Amino acid sequence: MRRGTCLLRGTTAISPGEKSPVEKSPDEKNPDMTDQINAPFPRPANAIRQAARLSVAPMMDWTDRHCRYLHRLLSHEALLYTEMVTAPALVRGGALHLLDHSPQEHPVALQLGGSDPAELAQAAAFGAEAGYDEINLNCGCPSDRVQSGAFGAVLMKSPDLVAECVAAMRAKVDVEVTVKCRIGVDDQDPQEVLPVFLERIAAAGCERVTIHARKAWLKGLSPKENRDIPPLDYDIVHQMKAEFPQLHISLNGGVASLDEALPHLERGLDGVMIGRAAYHQPSDILSQADPLIFGTGSATDPVAVVGHMLGYIDDQMAQGARLHQITRHMLGLFAGRPGARNWRRVLSEGASRPGADTRLVETALEQVTGIAA
């Protein structure tokens, strides 16, 4: 893949009133991206912690490599996560292709699912060798399929096992090992179980944790319902930061804008993780993240980002990808802007058709730029 074909800072900003030149930029137009590619991988832990001030949640079927590439165009700084990859798939199934990613995605973390310490340690080693900046253990997913493998949110019931898993992974890799968890499951009292859980994993060497501020119900609720029905309890996450000041703690759950994220940072949390809002309205979240959350650079323009996606799409299609596998992540780029509906319609109706290529994306973009011009 030709490096540096994406727009970040260091290129000319395009104002909302101008048409974007839809071009595939050469490397020399994107010095910031070139520097990012040439930076050492994995990144130092302090750099990853800074990136974790705002992160995009790992989301099954959504945060694949194409999604992450798009998100990196929108924010130079935010920490990105893979979809959950199961340790058995890597260790027993040999599915190392699941670790494929582009160098432009960094900083990027690999989320693992599993409950066997030795197997997780080996999977973590594969992830570190692949160049991921962080290995994250999933202790929050409530789906039946995940529970059947004895991992995900059900691990909230086994803090000692989680600690053993963390210790085994840390012994195997040099990159930071982190945990994503809930505040509890089923009838557990979060005030009782969450401090014990954090104490155990901290003793095992975990220094950074992301807490989804809801309980998970392992029976009776679907994964989607578990994201909405259990009530949010932000206060307990802030309480855990006060009780465990040595831990880097990020909050996840229900945060739908940067305006909602900022108060949590101002109250003392180390980071905020945003999920569905970052996927469905990526421009509203990620294009503004660098100046508002990190105090760096300026907002990125989604029209220009589309132009710079064209080279990536060409490269990926030459390697066998289909257009819709990439453009499905781009549907929300112009949410709330004139032309957004037609942008989505052109891509949704045409991207799966035989012969569809970047010309369709250019046609879709005209639905936006033609109105904005």
Q: Can you annotate each of these PLM segments?
A:
Residues 28-50, 54-60, 167, 172-174, ...:
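Alpha/beta catalytic cores of nucleotide-metabolism and tRNA/nucleoside-modifying enzymes
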Residues 34-44, 59-133:
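Glycine-rich, positively charged N-terminal anion/phosphate-binding segment
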Residues 56, 71, 83, 110, ...:
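Conserved, mostly hydrophobic/aromatic
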Residues 82, 134-143, 204-215, 274-277:
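Non-cysteine beta-strand/loop elements that form the S-adenosyl-L-methionine
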Residues 86, 114, 141-143, 183-187, ...:
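Active-site-proximal loop/turn and secondary-structure-junction residues that shape catalytic pockets
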Residues 107-178, 186-190:
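Active-site beta->alpha loop and helix N-cap motifs at the rims of alpha/beta catalytic domains
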Residues 144-161, 191-192, 220-232, 293-296:
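Glycine-rich tight-turn/loop motif centered on a GG-T
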